[in-house]
């Protein structure tokens, strides 16, 4: 039936900040849904707390609310905007849970809002583990034996029926949060306790283990007329027991017989019908026993998911767009498939003539204390996808796209002749970790057979055969050397996915020589199109991947082209903010008449949507892959400053190969990164830097440190996200750092900077054009003091405490730097402002990044100017004046950005903030005063306001004076104070009564006991030096486990306490309303 005419306004709930288990794939689906519904003439209202998303751009919906995603706030939006319907299936678990809350609190009924896309009962039945199991039984489908427990006693009783290992899955949590695998009673008690606490309904499913079974996922789309299609069948290379988000996955499924495939197909459609998903996309997960062939249904998601984003990119079938249209009444046969130019209807099941491999990207290097074993709780932070004509080609392309320094199936570095190392190898095969695939390859190098490896890993023998073949190619190539590389052999190796760099490594040559040889022998890639129909119909959509065959389908045009290099897989320190900038560049330059070419390999993002740019190359971002595309397309310019560190690393090599890099020159980028060259520029401009030195060996580091004085910030050069960065307070600390944390050498020196204690950090984003004109985008004052990585700190725009004189000085310095570096495009500068003895502000320059920074989307939303678009046009040759962007906008309202952390996922990690970036996402709050905006940002970040009760205060000596006002404010608001001896004595001297409590080392009952007993409602805890940090670690960890709000900086505590009275108050404003005020 055609679309419904009884609906006018539709509300879409987004997924909120990026967390592990819920990343940019929901920006992709939400942005698609907004577009699809507006194309049909509906008025769209959107709520999402994450400013770094494309979907929250003011032109994506008729009203965009960057507000907390909780039912209370959404009710205010519903009361104001009066939507007729709510589409909850586009924002992941967050949106589903919020929709259920709205239904349960009677909000939907009160305002007469209809749920479309998924009914309340369907969401309940799919999400509630017990209801789901019963439903499966009713349609004759098998589930693993299990039962639901609401208490530990119930769980222990169920366990006796299902045996060990036991799988525990909490209800209504995201990415398996709180779940796990217990091998004994002690582990069961720990995991169940955690799971009950994290589940909003305090229930967990205790289930029999199907570890080692094969895992499959079916992406199904269903419409109101009960037409069902399977968009894609995805096979997990890793067997059951590893969360599907952490598994290497392959599409189409490789090891199913036709009969098994039909069985899963019928079962998944039966599941959708039973659960009652009337329209839209769902994914159903199955386990198959490799010995008996028993099929069990694991779970289903009644919404678009991470897998549906993958399936969309793998097949070219835009699931979210189609699901949005089905939700308003269309049927599949009424919708056209865009990729084939409308030649086929959307009811045709996609068929693909290539293999797609997805590999997850982990960030365990950021969390050294975390357990790196993969279980049923998701731990990866991003993913990379690659396409090839064979499994091994797509696998090897994906491996080099991961950017973990691997160029193929690199050896793990184990000594395969040592018995100890072989024992390690076997352990790694058995207990999956992030590097398991590389251990599998090493196992074949050590002479193990496919049967041996299967017995340990349970990875299907078909995949193991493929990996064994790659290893044998490698061994032959290493034996034969470069002389044996003729055209047929090279072509065979390239078809198996070998990179030039890996081949060079195997024959002891370098990448350039191999490239020269390959080109001389005319072994070049061709590009094939993703057309969703296995080349049955022609396609006008240029969605391309490389392979080594005969016919090239790229057909480049002779228009003026700009190529944009994306950011690759998400990781901590480089996430959606950079993708946001790439998308904006593509949109702006397309409007200006350029043909835009996007190169990226991250399947979750909007940049890899086939209609974001004119041509999309789904390829790894390595020099080899990018150069081949440049040679074919011959772009007028290539943009490298938008994708974070990934394309920047290639800038110099691209330029050396004659690629036209536009915007700031690679030399200027290098000048800003190279400490010695940069120092000269700073001196020339007469600016101040904290005293710093460069050490090229460990002894030198200790000598130079004495010249500067402690405390120091130490770090390796050239890093993003503050990798391996630390604050050291004394010589023994520094000695340990240069010994353990980094390899110091001439090629990789260590940087020592004097650490500015109690300084205020400030971020400034600017745009410069080719004539040297500068537009200041925004000045942001950080709330946490200097020493906390800028990506982890909350910040306020405009600044809330800096004097106008200091702000003017910051602006003056930024303009000088932009001119000194000849910046064209975006630049981000970080300053620290410290008050000297005379009470004056002294400005220190910390660093300059002549590229897009992670604050660009936040600033753009706050000031109503699309900075990334303006800067892209500057890079393509326009001036700021031509774009009418010459004056800085300083809003009357405050915008606060707050960082979101994954600590709950990693047991054993200290949640204290420091110079290494560890946040995965961000939220934004707007208010008429700084405190009101801060309150809203905290609420959006799910940081709960502490109820009245006991507040615990324990701070380092330098903070004692500064914590007084915070303690006074707590007392005035009705809290009672509890403190450790040192802090307590100080508070009492200053007339504040407080109860004294033991530190952990001082004997029981101590502070951690009080937290465990639920006596403490709020914690202020600052520390200095490694020993003190590890002493107080248990306080912060326990606070996290028991969801007690805590602050690890005095500035953060002050802002939080002052914002308490604004919690949950005030009206909601759409971006459109706020931006209108700016024009007045």
Swiss-Prot record:
It catalyses: hydrogencarbonate + L-glutamine + 2 ATP + H2O = carbamoyl phosphate + L-glutamate + 2 ADP + phosphate + 2 H(+). The keyword Flavoprotein does not apply. CDD domains: MGS_CPS_II. Mg(2+) 1 binds at residues 285, 299. Residues 404-554 are annotated as: Oligomerization domain. Residues 555-942 are annotated as: Carbamoyl phosphate synthetic domain. Disulfide bonds: none annotated. Mn(2+) 3 binds at residues 830, 847. One of its GO terms (biological process) is L-arginine biosynthetic process. Its cofactor is Mg(2+); Mn(2+). Mn(2+) 2 binds at residues 299, 301. Belongs to the CarB family. HAMAP family: CPSase_L_chain_A (MF_01210_A), CPSase_L_chain_B (MF_01210_B). Large subunit of the glutamine-dependent carbamoyl phosphate synthetase (CPSase). CPSase catalyzes the formation of carbamoyl phosphate from the ammonia moiety of glutamine, carbonate, and phosphate donated by ATP, constituting the first step of 2 biosynthetic pathways, one leading to arginine and/or urea and the other to pyrimidine nucleotides. This is Carbamoyl phosphate synthase large chain. It comes from Xanthomonas axonopodis pv. citri (strain 306).
């Amino acid at each position: 039936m055609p679309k419904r005419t009884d609906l006018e306004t539709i509300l879409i709930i987004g997924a909120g900040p990026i967390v592990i288990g819920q990343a940019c794939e929901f920006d992709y689906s939400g942005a698609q849904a907004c577009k699809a519904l507006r194309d049909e003439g509906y008025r769209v209202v959107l709520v999402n707390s994450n400013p770094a998303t494309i979907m929250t751009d003011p032109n994506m919906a008729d009203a965009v609310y960057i507000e907390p995603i909780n039912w209370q706030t959404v009710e205010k939006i519903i009361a104001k905007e009066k939507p007729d319907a709510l589409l909850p299936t586009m924002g992941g678990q967050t949106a589903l849970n919020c929709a259920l809350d709205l239904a349960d609190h009677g909000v939907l009924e009160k305002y007469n809002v209809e749920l479309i896309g998924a009914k309340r009962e369907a969401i309940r039945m799919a999400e509630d583990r017990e209801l789901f199991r019963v439903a499966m039984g009713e349609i004759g489908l098998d589930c693993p034996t299990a039962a639901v427990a609401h208490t530990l006693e119930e769980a222990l009783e169920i366990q006796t029926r299902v045996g060990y290992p036991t799988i525990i899955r909490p209800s209504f949590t995201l990415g398996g949060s709180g779940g796990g695998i217990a091998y004994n009673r002690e582990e069961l008690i720990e995991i169940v306790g955690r799971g009950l606490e994290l589940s909003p309904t305090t229930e967990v499913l205790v289930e029999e283990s199907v570890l080692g079974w094969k895992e499959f996922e079916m992406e199904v789309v269903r419409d109101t007329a009960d037409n069902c299609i399977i968009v894609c069948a995805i096979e997990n290379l890793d067997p059951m027991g590893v969360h599907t988000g952490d598994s290497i996955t392959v599409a189409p499924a490789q090891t199913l017989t036709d009969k098994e495939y039909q069985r899963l197909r019928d079962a998944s459609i039966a599941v959708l019908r039973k659960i009652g998903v009337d329209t839209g996309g769902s994914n159903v997960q199955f386990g198959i026993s490799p010995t008996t062939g028993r099929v069990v249904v694991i779970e289903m998601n009644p919404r678009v998911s991470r897998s549906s984003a993958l399936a969309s990119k793998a097949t070219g079938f835009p699931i979210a767009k189609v699901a949005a249209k089905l939700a308003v009444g269309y049927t599949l046969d009424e919708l056209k498939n865009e990729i084939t130019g409308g030649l086929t209807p959307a009811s045709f099941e996609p068929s693909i003539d290539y293999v797609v491999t997805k590999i997850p990207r982990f960030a365990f290097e950021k969390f050294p204390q975390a357990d790196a074993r993969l279980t049923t709780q998701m731990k990866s932070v991003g993913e990379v996808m690659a396409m090839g004509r064979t499994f091994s080609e797509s696998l090897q392309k994906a491996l080099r796209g991961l950017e973990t320094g691997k160029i193929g199936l690199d050896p793990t570095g184990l000594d395969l002749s040592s018995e100890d190392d072989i024992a390690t190898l076997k352990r790694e095969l058995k207990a999956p970790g992030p590097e398991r695939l590389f251990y599998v390859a090493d196992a074949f190098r050590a002479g193990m057979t496919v049967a041996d490896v299967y017995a340990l890993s349970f990875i299907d023998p078909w995949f193991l055969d493929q990996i064994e073949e790659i290893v044998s190619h490698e061994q032959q190539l290493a034996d034969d050397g470069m002389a044996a590389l003729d055209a047929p052999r090279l072509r065979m190796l390239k078809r198996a996915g070998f990179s030039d760099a890996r081949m060079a490594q195997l024959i002891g040559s370098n990448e350039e020589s191999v490239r020269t040889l390959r080109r001389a022998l005319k072994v070049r890639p061709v590009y094939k199109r993703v057309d969703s129909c296995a080349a049955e119909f022609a396609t006008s959509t240029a969605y391309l991947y490389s392979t080594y065959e005969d016919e090239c389908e790229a057909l480049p045009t002779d228009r003026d082209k700009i190529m944009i290099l994306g950011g690759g897989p998400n990781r901590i320190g480089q996430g959606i903010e950079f993708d946001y900038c790439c998308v904006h560049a593509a949109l702006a330059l397309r409007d200006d008449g350029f043909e835009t070419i996007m190169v990226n390999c991250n399947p979750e993002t909007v940049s890899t949507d086939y209609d974001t740019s004119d041509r999309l190359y789904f390829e790894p971002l390595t020099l080899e892959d990018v150069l081949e595309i440049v040679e074919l397309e011959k772009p007028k310019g290539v943009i490298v400053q938008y994708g974070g560190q990934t394309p920047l690393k290639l800038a110099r090599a691209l330029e050396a190969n004659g690629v036209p890099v536009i915007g700031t020159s690679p030399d200027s980028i290098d000048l800003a990164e190279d400490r010695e060259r940069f120092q000269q520029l700073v001196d020339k401009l007469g600016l101040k830097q904290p005293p710093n030195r460069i050490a090229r060996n460990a002894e030198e580091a200790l000598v130079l440190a004495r010249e500067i004085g402690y405390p120091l910030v130490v770090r390796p050069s050239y890093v993003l996200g503050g990798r391996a960065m630390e604050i050291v307070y004394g010589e023994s600390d520094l000695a340990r750092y240069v010994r353990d944390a980094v390899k110091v050498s001439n090629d990789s020196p260590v940087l020592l900077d004097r650490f500015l204690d109690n300084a205020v950090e400030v971020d400034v984003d600017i745009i410069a054009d080719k004539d040297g004109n500068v537009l200041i985008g925004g000045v942001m004052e950080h709330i946490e003091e200097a020493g906390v990585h800028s990506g982890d700190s909350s910040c306020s725009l405009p600044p809330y405490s800096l004097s106008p004189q200091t702000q003017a000085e910051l602006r003056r310095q930024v303009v000088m730097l932009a001119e000194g570096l000849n910046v064209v495009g975006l630049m981000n500068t970080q300053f620290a402002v410290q008050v000297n003895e005379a009470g004056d502000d002294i400005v220190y320059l910390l660093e300059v990044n002549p590229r897009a920074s992670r604050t660009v989307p936040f600033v753009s939303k706050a000031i109503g100017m699309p900075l990334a678009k303006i800067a892209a046009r500057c890079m393509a040759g326009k001036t700021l004046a031509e774009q009418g962007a010459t004056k800085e906008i300083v809003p009357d309202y405050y915008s606060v950005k707050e960082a979101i952390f994954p600590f709950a996922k990693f047991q054993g990690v200290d949640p204290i903030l420091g110079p290494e970036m560890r946040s995965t996402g961000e939220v934004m709050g707007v208010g008429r005063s700084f405190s009101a905006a801060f309150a809203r940002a905290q609420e959006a970040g799910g940081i709960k306001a502490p109820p009245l009760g006991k507040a615990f205060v324990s701070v380092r000596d330098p903070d004692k004076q500064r914590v007084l006002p915070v303690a006074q404010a707590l007392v005035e608001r009705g809290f009672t104070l509890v403190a450790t001896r040192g802090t307590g004595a100080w508070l009492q001297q200053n007339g504040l009564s407080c109860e004294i409590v033991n530190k952990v080392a001082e004997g029981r009952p101590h502070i951690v006991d009080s937290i465990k007993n639920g006596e403490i409602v709020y914690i202020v805890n600052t520390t200095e030096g490694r020993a003190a940090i590890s002493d107080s670690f248990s306080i912060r960890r326990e606070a996290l486990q028991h969801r007690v709000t805590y602050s690890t900086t005095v500035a953060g505590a002050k802002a939080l306490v002052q914002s308490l009275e604004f919690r949950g108050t005030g009206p909601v404003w759409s971006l459109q309303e706020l931006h209108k005020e700016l024009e007045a």
